[in-house]
Curated annotation (Swiss-Prot):
It holds the Pfam family Phos_pyr_kin. The gene is pdxK. ATP binds at residues 125, 157, 162, 195, 222-225, 232. This is Pyridoxine/pyridoxal/pyridoxamine kinase. The keyword Amino-acid biosynthesis does not apply. Substrate binds at residues 23, 59, 234. Keywords: ATP-binding, Kinase, Magnesium, Metal-binding, Nucleotide-binding, Transferase, Zinc. It catalyses: pyridoxal + ATP = pyridoxal 5'-phosphate + ADP + H(+); pyridoxine + ATP = pyridoxine 5'-phosphate + ADP + H(+); pyridoxamine + ATP = pyridoxamine 5'-phosphate + ADP + H(+).
Length: 283
């Protein structure tokens, strides 16, 4: 006698720790393509929601793909809830977004989650651009972050250029960087970690990161590795979140995450690889 297949609706949903909402590439190590392996290294289950799906990053001679259609994107988010997968989610992680409409949709979706789970972590890397390239996201993204997403963030990881874009304040010195970061603390926001903070002030061969909270500001310093693959910010954000979920204080989590990125950069340089090679076991 053939047994009937169990009704999926009667089975327990897959427990999800992290909803990671960012880019996805077929080839390369950026967005969720690098974040998911990092999260998995911490033993975390991830629902990876793509914002754009690309063959590779735009710095290659050819690229295919684009932003996920908005109705698909909203459907991905809605169906996570419909499957009952969000009950135990510990953090929502945001990276590269495909445009302001996605930011607005995300704002509504996250606000609904936070209304039910006021303690839910929302970690946002407000991807806008950098000092070398300028703005490389869709027009209107700065305003979209300000209007729809920053009020929901518990933590932010802008680089110095993005901090300046979001606040409209100078960030040339470390003091200015810390002051600008503090203007983003309010409401839900507990910390801002500024990567590539005040680069004009760095000693030769060093890189600085500012970790800013309501009560404290620490400047971390690490070696500069002479290679520049894409995806280091995405890797840092995932590693940071992993260490925070493991119970580390924010400054220590940032230090450990930076160390993981440095190890990956050193491995990448030694291999002569054009894409980021993930480092070894977690520390």
């Amino acid at each position: 006698m053939k047994l009937a297949a169990p009704n999926p609706q009667a089975l327990a949903p897959l427990p999800i720790d992290v909803v990671s909402i960012q880019s996805q590439v077929v080839y390369g190590q950026v967005g969720n393509s690098v974040a998911v392996p990092v999260f998995n290294g911490f033993g975390l289950r991830v629902a990876a929601v793509p914002t754009v799906v690309l063959s590779n990053t735009p710095h290659y001679p050819s690229m295919h793909g684009g932003a996920v259609p908005l109705d698909w994107f909203e459907g991905y988010l809605a169906d996570l809830g419909a499957r009952g997968a969000l009950a135990g989610v510990r953090v929502v992680q945001l990276g590269y977004l495909g445009g302001p409409a996605q930011a607005e949709a995300l704002g509504r979706w996250i606000a609904g989650l936070v209304a039910v789970r006021p303690d839910l972590r929302v970690h946002i890397d407000p991807v806008i651009g950098d000092h070398d390239s300028g703005v490389y996201v869709a027009p209107g993204m700065v305003a979209a972050y300000r209007d729809h997403l920053l009020p929901l963030a518990q933590g932010l990881t802008p680089n110095g250029f993005e901090l300046e874009c979001l606040t409209g304040l100078p960030t040339g010195t470390m003091e200015q960087t810390i002051a600008a970061a503090r203007t983003l603390l309010g409401g839900r926001a507990r910390w801002v970690i500024v990567t590539s903070a005040a680069p004009a002030t760095w000693p030769p061969g060093r890189v600085r990161v500012a970790v800013v909270t309501h009560d404290d500001a620490q400047v971390l310093e690490h070696a500069h590795v002479d290679t520049a693959p894409k995806g280091t910010g995405d890797m840092f954000g995932a590693a940071l979140t992993g260490h925070l979920l493991a119970g580390q204080p924010v400054a220590e989590a940032a230090r450990r995450a930076a160390l993981q990125v440095i190890e990956a950069l050193e491995r990448t340089r030694e291999a002569g690889c054009g894409e980021l090679l993930l480092a070894g076991p977690l520390r």
